[in-house]
Amino acid sequence: MTLQSESRFYYQLLAAVLIPALFVAWAARLRQNRKYPPGPKGIPIFGNLFQLSTRPWIEFSAFKEQYGPLVYLNIVGQPLLITNTHTAATDLFDRRGGVYSDRPRSIVADYLTGGLYLPFARHGPTWLKLRRAGHAFMHKGVAHKYRDTQFKEALTLTHHLLQSPSGRRRQLFESAEASIHSIVYDQPSSGGPVYPKMTDFSTLINKAVTPLFTPAEFLPLMQYVPSWLAGWKRRAQQGFVLFSELCEGLLEEVAKRVDAGDDRPSMAGGLIREREKHGLTNLEAAWLSGMMILVGTETNTLAMSWFLYAMIAYPDKQKRCQAELDAVVGRSRMPTFEDLEKLPYLRATIREILRWRPSIPVGARHYTTKDDWYQGYFIPKGTICFPNVWSLNHDPAIYGTDADHFNPGRFIDKDGGLSPAIPATKDGAFLIPHHDLHNSHGLNPPKMQKVCLRFIDLHTFRSKYPLSIAVPGHVSYGFGSRICLGRHIANDALFINFASILWATSISPAMNANTGKPDVPDKLAYSNLGLLIVPTTTECVIQPRFDEAEGILAQTRELCM
């Protein structure tokens, strides 16, 4: 070996040693320089696990006071990010949806749903085509097609509430299930064998994503244990087969009516006709239809339960709704969808129910698909992100000092109309008086301009526009491409249910069996089932509001049958 070649060899050897060492040092320095969002200190291995209760939205909201709008946690090695302000939530989940629109993997849910249950599906080709197909039959432009069905079911629900003195939650659940079943499958649920199978699967799927439901979520190697040894895997696989058979059977019944030309507008019928257009397999179309039943029934039941609770806890709000109905509809006919635009306080009541008591207060989970930086903080790939809906919907800086209370009047402008709102959904723009956002004195010009309010910083908006112009709505339907597909249909159902019940009935607290006095509920109390919040009671006394109410209700039902 010559001196020159020997020197070259040593230089190459030195480079081979130094370059990796420098890279490791650089990577370590980079990690040190990464500034993670603030958050409470945890303990080794478990992190912040033991700092959370069965109501994590309460701890998340408390963290906001100490750490600010972003809170970073670690749960057994899994990074969590909590967003506690509208600005942070919309910045990340709306504007940066490409990074934050995925869902974290749930091993149990994967076996249970085969990746076909849209709310839990990972971002990818299957999720995308299911989402597009669902949107085609649930967007705002087609929601009106289902209003006849919703009107009939609202009349039936009002009738049952008047006839039966107890079992309110059961009545609300059966009504929601019947209405959505009719919309999806063009036939009301008979309460037969389909009903318990749907409810059983709903319970199973909610458990599947509940923390600590199975050790497999924290010990991924357990997924490779044979099903005959792993009871959780066996039950999940059986659940997938049973629910698939159920949904395929329901879809087949609709297909027969479509072939015979004997069907009315329905989501399943539309999916059958356009299945090839959307690239869906029969199993995917069946699961998409079944998903609509599961999600729609539970969320509608919860909203209706909170409606009854609010009406007995805040009787003055009930009376104001009824006064508006008397002024607009009168007492000679039932309210219809034709009255919707003329009932601003009733519509504000819907918005306030959804704001005041969101069904999932902690928000649906999002998942980062790559590293990101926000406001100087590093958010690593693989972080589970929660938009803390409870904190967002109860922010006193936006909704006022009474944000914890039920008050539809916060959405009524000085002229008595429904205020335009920072969208409760992600739909389009709102017409607002045109002026420069930096000029708070330019409200006189009559020119109107469309502004996408979703992407305006809410605190900036509130400081520039008076409350009579707009008040933010709610974020209970979610964010970005993960926003609830059926929100327009849900809003229609709530409107006609609220209107029918309040027009025909008076709602008052149930009598306490021990004291003989009305059992008025605590205005701020609630219970929780897993990550859902429910009223402490739905029992109440429902009576005809005036002498002719039951007769007009019966006549209207007969005409609609």
Swiss-Prot record:
Stimuli inducing this protein: Expression is highly induced during artificial growth in symbiosis with Populus, which is close to its natural condition.
Main location: membrane
Enzyme Commission designation: 1.-.-.-
Binding sites annotated in the UniProt record for heme: C484
EC supergroup of this enzyme: oxidoreductase
One example GO MF annotation: oxidoreductase activity, acting on paired donors, with incorporation or reduction of molecular oxygen
Gene Ontology annotations for the cellular component aspect, listed alphabetically: membrane
Pfam families with a match to the protein in the record: p450
Record's keyword terms, sorted: Heme, Iron, Membrane, Metal-binding, Monooxygenase, Oxidoreductase, Transmembrane, Transmembrane helix
Annotated SUPFAM superfamilies: Cytochrome P450
Localization (cell): Membrane
Named cofactor requirement(s): heme
Biological pathway: Secondary metabolite biosynthesis
Membrane-spanning intervals of the chain: 8-28
Protein task: Cytochrome P450 monooxygenase; part of the gene cluster that mediates the biosynthesis of the psychoactive metabolites ibotenic acid and muscimol. The first committed step is glutamate hydroxylation by the 2-oxoglutarate-dependent dioxygenase iboH, and the last step is decarboxylation of ibotenic acid to muscimol by the decarboxylase iboD. The order of the intermediate reactions is somewhat ambiguous. IboA likely activates the carboxylic acid at position 5 to introduce an amide bond, and the flavin monooxygenase iboF generates the N-O bond. There are several options for the latter step.
Similarity comment: family membership: Belongs to the cytochrome P450 family.
Protein name: Cytochrome P450 monooxygenase iboC
Organism of provenance: Amanita muscaria (strain Koide BX008)
Gene expressing this chain: iboC
